[in-house]
Regions:
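N-acyltransferase acceptor-side catalytic subdomain
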Residues: 1-162
Length: 162
């Protein structure tokens, strides 16, 4: 992979033209987040020597308030692994991702309480880079209930019906 420069963009006017159809990493979503209270969008852009964009990731810095105990904190959230140039190989894509991940981690180390990545298409994508940057996996429990196997009246007990 050629030398890649990674930069962080916080203003929609500074975003270069992008390719890709992933709505979670689009310029339009960035502009919507700019207008949303308590959310600050951050675009991580990787370009090669020629200035061509080889990858980008949209992150959101969210300001949260909790009542007990009362405090304000921020966290960074990213959906998916980002968008990449179609001409780069999977190995190069993972290297570009590693550079963008390291840049984002350094930038968020003093600004956010935690950084959360979710909805990765391949659970092993970038695993080595996540581990070297101090991330760890959290297994969430998913519950899927099927309401189509029985009629609603059959699901209720006799106490609930009367």
């Amino acid at each position: 992979m050629q030398e890649v420069e990674v930069r962080i963009i916080t203003n929609s006017n500074d975003i270069p033209p992008m390719e890709g159809s992933n709505v979670f990493h689009s310029r339009q979503l960035f502009c919507m987040y700019e207008q949303t209270p308590r959310i600050k969008p951050i675009m991580i852009v990787a370009t090669n020597r020629g200035g061509t964009m080889v990858g980008h990731v949209l992150a959101t810095l969210r300001y949260r308030w909790t009542w007990l105990p009362p405090f304000l904190y921020t966290h960074c959230r990213i959906y998916g692994e980002g968008c990449y140039d179609t001409q780069i190989s999977d190995k190069d894509k993972e290297e570009v991702f590693g550079k963008m991940l390291a840049t984002l981690t350094r930038a968020m180390s003093y600004r956010a309480l935690y950084v959360e990545w979710s909805n990765l298409s391949n659970k092993l994508f970038g695993y080595r880079h996540f581990r070297t940057n101090g991330y760890f996996p959290v297994h969430w429990m998913s519950i899927h209930n099927s309401l189509h196997s029985m009629a609603p009246q059959e699901r209720l007990s006799s106490k609930r019906i009367n």
